């Protein structure tokens, strides 16, 4: 029965994410285009909703006991969040630690295309990306770009230092 509840929670989460992809593309994105001054608050609220969407079904339907972290990370320039990447729940739990606003997550290049919700999310939030298979010259350019982004961004940057699994 517990296994069935886990699968049901996963199905509910996936359906919610697919519906959220449509909302994100057709409501959130255009809203930001019309009201760019509300970017941090709108994207922060949207990301908090997505974190809730991913974690809540596992608690309610699946019976999982997930941590509820304190909101301690300020949304301001110059904040670097370093986390160990253990599961797909790391990002939603990291988002729940923000006092306001949203995180810019350093992500792999392959996640920026053709993945429902995730690819559009990475463009909407302007996530910096890296390509682990890049040659030395490209890797140096990516590091320079990351340095520039980290100095200019208004929100915290999240990085998983161990890279890929």
Outline where the language-model segments fall:
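Membrane-anchoring hydrophobic helices of lipid-metabolizing enzymes
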Residues: 1-79, 92-93
């Amino acid at each position: 029965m517990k296994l069935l509840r886990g699968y049901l929670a996963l199905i509910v989460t996936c359906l919610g994410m697919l519906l959220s992809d449509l909302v994100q593309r057709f409501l959130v994105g255009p809203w930001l285009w019309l009201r760019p001054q509300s970017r941090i608050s709108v994207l922060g609220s949207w990301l908090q909703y997505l974190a809730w969407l991913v974690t809540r079904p596992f608690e309610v339907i699946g019976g999982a006991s997930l941590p509820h972290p304190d909101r301690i990370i300020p949304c301001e320039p110059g904040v670097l969040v370093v986390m160990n990447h253990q599961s797909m729940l790391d990002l939603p739990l990291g988002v729940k630690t923000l006092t306001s606003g949203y995180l810019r997550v350093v992500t792999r290049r392959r996640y920026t295309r053709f993945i429902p919700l995730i690819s559009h999310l990475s463009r909407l939030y302007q996530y910096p990306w890296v390509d682990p298979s890049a040659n030395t010259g490209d890797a140096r350019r990516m590091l320079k770009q990351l340095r520039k982004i980290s100095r200019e961004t208004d929100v915290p940057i999240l990085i998983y230092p161990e890279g890929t699994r």
